[in-house]
């Protein structure tokens, strides 16, 4: 029976994907196998959309493979890290899910394998530690079994927090046209034109590597907490913003596409700084990119917090 919202053809594709999942090594298999199948099938469209969103940071438009950096973004944005189960442990699950293939990227079935594994070990962080030498104390720990831990992680963390592949389109339709965003960009058009000329080195298009180098030279790839607010920009986010803003990403950005790319990047970088409205996020990022302000200057101007600078 095809899951809700899935056509018979898509259902055939899903069954092919499901058969490729490597779950036999996870505790309790195969007792929960049908239940895990049903949980994944019920959320299939959302999980496909999330996978495409994080796998979108490559020029070939290859939203079919997720690399480790893209996976890191997913883990952080979906709030999967806990005190007892950090990113290093999760990246071990990335490697296990990818076992047997000769690449360092995850395809969709490997991504699903990894979600199931992470949900179990995240809910049972003691499990791996007590295996073997500590087996006699096993009963002291309460197992949180599958499929419950998977359902809970999806409904509480992954589905509400992770980006989907409509993210770029929603930005174009709802955030970009806001008067405050247009005013923030409009106030710096001349400086942006100069920036474009310099960074593109006079070419007809601004290339991805030129854009990444410009961000890197201003130290804008960072993960900071300032006055209690997370302020973060990663290379996959910057690439995704570039590709979403360019009509022909392989050629690069045209002059009128640069402001759009900057607005996207600004709203990603300052996404969690709630005292900044969208216009202020763009203004702040422009002052990072074109001026002398760093992230702390931008955030503290909004929060009124005390600077840590000498």
Please provide the spans of the model-predicted regions.
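Charged interaction scaffolds used for protein-protein
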Residues: 1-310
């Amino acid at each position: 029976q095809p899951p809700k919202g899935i056509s018979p053809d898509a259902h055939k594709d899903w069954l092919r994907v499901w058969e490729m999942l490597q779950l036999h090594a996870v505790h309790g298999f195969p007792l929960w196998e049908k239940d895990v199948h049903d949980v994944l099938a019920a959320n299939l469209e959302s999980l496909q959309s999330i996978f495409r969103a994080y796998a979108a940071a490559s020029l070939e438009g290859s939203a079919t493979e997720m690399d480790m950096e893209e996976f890191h973004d997913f883990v952080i944005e979906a709030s999967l890290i806990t005190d007892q189960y950090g990113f290093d442990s999760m990246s071990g699950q990335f490697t296990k899910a990818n076992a047997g293939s000769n690449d360092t990227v995850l395809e969709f079935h490997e991504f699903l394998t990894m979600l199931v594994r992470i949900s179990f070990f995240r809910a049972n962080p003691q499990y791996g530690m007590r295996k073997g030498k500590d087996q006699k104390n096993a009963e002291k720990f309460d197992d949180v079994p599958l499929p419950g831990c998977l359902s809970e992680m999806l409904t509480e963390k992954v589905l509400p927090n992770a980006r989907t592949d409509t993210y770029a389109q929603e930005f174009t339709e709802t955030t970009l046209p806001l008067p405050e965003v247009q005013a923030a960009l409009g106030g710096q058009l001349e400086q942006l034109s100069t920036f474009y000329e310099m960074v593109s080195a006079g070419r007809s298009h601004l290339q991805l590597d030129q854009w990444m180098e410009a961000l890197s030279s201003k130290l804008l790839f960072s993960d900071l907490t300032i006055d209690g607010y997370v302020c973060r920009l990663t290379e996959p986010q910057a690439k995704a913003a570039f590709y979403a803003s360019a009509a022909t990403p392989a050629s690069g950005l045209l002059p009128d596409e640069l402001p759009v790319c900057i607005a996207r990047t600004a709203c990603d970088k300052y996404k969690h700084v709630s005292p900044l409205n969208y216009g202020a996020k763009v203004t702040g990022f422009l002052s990072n990119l074109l001026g002398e302000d760093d992230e702390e200057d931008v955030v503290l101007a909004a929060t009124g917090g005390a600077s840590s600078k000498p």
